Structure formats: structure tokens, C-alpha cells
């Protein structure tokens, strides 16, 4: 039990889920009583939603002040991020509606503990577009954080980030404080994620005990559907963008294969960030472009997370028979265009933003998160891998658009004519 294998969170969660399935199947009544473990984990995740989004967005925007190529490069990068992440959201929405992996589960939302999401209970109501947009503006900043309204926190974070950016060197102290606070928050998240096996065990034992083994088949359909969607997105969407930019997506994937293995092992695209900065520069992208696009992309260009968010949200609606008409789905898309920008490339961040998004939409049962808690860890690999490839492609595209890409060097490196570690570098 003390071997390195059992120290892996991935193995721990896998083991916990297996135990939860067995307990729920053979002792359904006892399995159903394990529900509080899953609820407790969800509450712990909710506890850090507001601060993690605030810190991530503020440091992401204000952090641009230390980079030279902010102007045109920043505008092009943000435009690219918005367009491609929107495409990812739409693709996820379309496929989950076509495949309908949650249809037939017939989960009664009333059996899901609403107390676990009491902070957002008052938002569970329909409202018009005008009322929805006005609700984004908080009555007070403290109130936004106290109520856990993610859109209000996000709006304040964006304004705060831009204001801090305009202060320049005068705001460096504040930036450093927020960045340090952000590290503390992510430290808390890491501690919470260590409890993921317990939460996954409780959620899976309850789900199987309450709804039977057939539920696992439905959850398996969601996992398979999500992985296939991510593969199609990388090959078709990112592949087409890469081809239009002048390189092969398959050769690019081969080039960053070591970074992909790191991400696969950690389920976090952030774990490969330092290596990606170096790799993209050696590929032929100017250092100033790499320094701006890669870090910013970890908050604003998470394609895999975008696909996950739409698919998971609609899956919960299908599983709980919560009707979502075209207005509700458009509202979900609009909310995700905002809230998905607050997801950092770390393990568990997708689940955090999903919880925030569902609560902000106000139409889906937030307690329904317990349905996918047990499998979220297994979807994180596809999220992280897609995010990493997406940010790499974005860097090359932006570099070419702003004419800061050495196309010959990129071609030589991708075709193994010049070793990446010996290719010449472009200085900023």
C-alpha cells in the first residue's frame, strides 16, 4: 500500500470508484448512505470558486504589463482565443444534444441534496435576457463574493485587472500580493483534490446504490462521447487551423509528445507550461509572443475545458430530465463564454468552473454535479491534453499573424531537419 502506484491520485480515485461501484451494487442501501462524502467534497470545491476565478483573471490580465508585445499581439491573441473557444463550446453543445448520453437516467433532482449547493439556491429561477445581464452587475463587491455569484465576481475581476494594468509599476505590489494569494488558493485546491477519492467513492456508491449499475453505463457513454469529441476537435478544427497556418497538426503533436506525456500523467496542462514556453520559442515563435500567448491562454484558451463544460452541463440536464429549450442553451453558451475564461489549467479547475456555471445559469440542479463527480477525474486527461495542444497551436497562429514567426525554422524543426535544441532563437 506504500508503493508509488498507490500514491498516485489517479489510482486512488480509480480504486475509490471501483469500491463505490461494488458497495452500491451489492449493498445499495449502505451505498446510498455514502452520499454525504460526495456532498462534502462538492461544498469544499464551491468554497474556493470565487477566489480562484478572481485571482486567475486578475493576474492573467494585469500580468500583461511586464510584456513588451501587448498591443497588437494581445488583441490578436484574445480574438483568436474567443473565436476558437466559442467553436469548442458550440461543438460540445451540438454533439451532446445529438448523442444524448444522459437520456434515460431519469434522476430525480429532489433526491440530490440541495443543501450542498445552498449558496446558489436563490439563483435557480428563470429570468429574461435583460434581467440576466443586469444581475451580472453586483450590488456590492463584498456581496458578490459572499453570495458566490461567479459572473459578478468575474466582472469585478476583469475591471480590477484592467485598472491594475493601467497603474503600471505603481500596481506591482498589489499584483504581487494577488499572485501570492493565488498560489495559496491553488495550494488549498491541491489539498482539497487529495480528498477526491473520498468524494468520488461517496458519489459513486450513492449513484449506483440509488440508481443501479445501469447508471455506470450512462456515465461511460459520457466519457466515451467526450474523448471522441476532443479527438475530433484536435484533428478537424485545430488540424484545419494548423494547415491554414502552414504546418501539420500531427507533426506538431509529435514535436510536443514529451509535454503531452507530462500532462497525461498529471491531468494538468499547467504542469507542462515551462517546457512549452521553451519549446514554442525553439519552434520559431518570437519570445515576446510566446511569453504573452502561452500564459494568457491558460486562462482564456482552454478548448478541452470548453467542450467539457457544455457537454457536462447538458448531460446533467438530460440525466435529471431538466428541460433545456433553445433559450436556456443559448443562455448556457453565453455564461460559458464568460465563466470558462476563469478556468486555470490545473487539475479540478474544470469541475470548479462547471459548478460555478450551473449555479449562474439558474436552471439546472447544481446538486446534479454529484452525478459526474466520480468520473470527472477520468475526463480531466482529455481536457488537459486538448488544452495543451490548443495553446500550442494558438501561439504559432498568433505569431504568424503578427509576423513574428520564422516559418523556415518551424518547418525544419517539425520535419526533423534541425534538432529543436539546436535551432536558433528569435530574441524579442
From Swiss-Prot:
The gene coding this protein: dctA
Please state which protein family the record places this protein in.
Answer: Belongs to the dicarboxylate/amino acid:cation symporter (DAACS) (TC 2.A.23) family.
Query: Where is the protein localized?
Result: Cell inner membrane
An example GO BP is: L-aspartate transmembrane transport
UniProt function note: Responsible for the transport of dicarboxylates such as succinate, fumarate, and malate from the periplasm across the membrane.
Its predominant location is membrane
Protein name per UniProt: C4-dicarboxylate transport protein
Q: Pfam families under this entry?
A: SDF (PF00375)
**Is this entry keyworded Transmembrane helix?**
yes
What superkingdom heads the lineage?
Answer: Bacteria
* Bilayer topology term: Multi-pass membrane protein
Gene Ontology annotations for the cellular component aspect, listed alphabetically: plasma membrane
Transmembrane residues, as ranges?
A: 8-28, 44-64, 76-96, 142-162, 184-204, 222-242, 289-309, 326-346, 352-372
Q: Which UniProt keywords apply?
A: Cell inner membrane, Cell membrane, Membrane, Symport, Transmembrane, Transmembrane helix, Transport
Molecular function GO labels: fumarate transmembrane transporter activity; malate:proton symporter activity; succinate transmembrane transporter activity
Is the Cell membrane keyword given for this protein? yes
Amino acid at each position: 500500500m506504500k508503493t508509488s502506484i498507490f500514491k498516485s491520485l489517479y489510482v486512488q480515485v480509480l480504486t475509490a470508484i471501483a469500491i463505490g461501484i461494488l458497495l452500491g451494487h451489492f449493498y445499495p442501501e449502505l451505498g446510498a448512505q455514502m452520499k454525504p462524502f460526495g456532498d462534502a467534497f462538492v461544498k469544499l470545491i464551491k468554497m474556493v470558486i470565487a477566489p480562484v476565478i478572481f485571482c486567475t483573471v486578475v493576474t492573467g490580465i494585469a500580468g500583461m504589463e511586464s510584456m513588451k508585445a501587448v498591443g497588437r499581439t494581445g488583441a490578436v491573441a484574445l480574438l483568436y482565443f474567443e473565436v476558437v473557444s466559442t467553436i469548442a463550446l458550440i461543438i460540445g453543445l451540438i454533439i451532446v444534444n445529438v448523442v444524448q448520453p444522459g437520456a434515460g437516467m431519469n434522476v430525480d433532482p429532489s433526491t440530490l441534496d440541495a443543501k450542498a449547493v445552498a449558496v446558489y439556491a436563490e439563483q435557480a429561477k428563470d429570468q429574461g435576457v435583460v434581467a440576466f445581464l443586469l444581475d451580472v452587475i453586483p450590488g456590492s463587491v463584498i456581496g458578490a463574493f459572499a453570495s458566490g455569484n461567479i459572473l459578478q465576481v468575474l466582472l469585478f475581476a476583469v475591471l480590477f485587472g484592467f485598472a491594475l494594468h493601467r497603474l503600471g509599476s505603481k500596481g506591482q505590489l498589489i499584483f504581487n500580493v494577488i499572485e501570492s494569494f493565488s498560489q495559496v488558493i491553488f495550494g488549498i485546491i491541491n489539498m482539497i483534490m487529495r480528498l477526491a477519492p473520498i468524494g468520488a467513492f461517496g458519489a459513486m456508491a450513492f449513484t449506483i446504490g440509488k440508481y443501479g449499475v445501469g447508471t455506470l453505463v450512462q456515465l461511460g457513454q459520457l466519457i466515451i462521447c467526450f474523448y471522441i469529441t476532443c479527438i475530433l476537435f484536435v484533428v478537424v478544427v485545430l488540424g484545419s487551423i494548423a494547415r491554414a497556418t502552414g504546418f501539420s497538426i500531427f507533426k506538431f503533436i509529435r514535436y510536443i509528445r514529451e509535454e503531452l506525456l507530462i500532462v497525461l500523467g498529471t491531468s494538468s496542462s499547467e504542469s507542462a507550461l515551462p517546457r512549452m514556453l521553451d519549446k514554442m520559442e525553439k519552434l520559431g515563435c518570437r519570445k515576446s509572443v510566446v511569453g504573452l500567448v502561452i500564459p494568457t491562454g491558460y486562462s482564456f484558451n482552454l478548448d478541452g475545458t470548453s467542450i467539457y463544460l457544455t457537454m457536462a452541463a447538458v448531460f446533467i440536464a438530460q440525466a435529471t430530465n431538466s428541460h433545456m429549450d433553445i433559450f436556456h442553451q443559448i443562455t448556457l453558451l453565453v455564461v460559458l463564454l464568460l465563466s470558462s475564461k476563469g478556468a486555470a489549467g490545473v487539475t479540478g479547475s474544470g469541475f470548479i468552473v462547471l459548478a460555478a456555471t450551473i449555479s449562474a445559469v439558474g436552471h439546472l440542479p447544481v446538486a446534479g454535479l454529484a452525478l459526474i463527480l466520480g468520473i470527472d477525474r477520468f475526463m480531466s486527461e482529455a481536457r488537459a491534453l486538448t488544452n495543451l495542444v490548443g495553446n500550442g497551436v494558438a501561439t504559432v497562429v498568433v505569431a504568424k499573424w503578427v509576423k513574428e514567426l520564422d516559418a523556415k525554422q518551424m518547418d525544419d524543426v517539425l520535419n526533423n531537419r534541425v534538432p529543436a535544441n539546436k535551432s536558433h532563437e528569435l530574441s524579442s
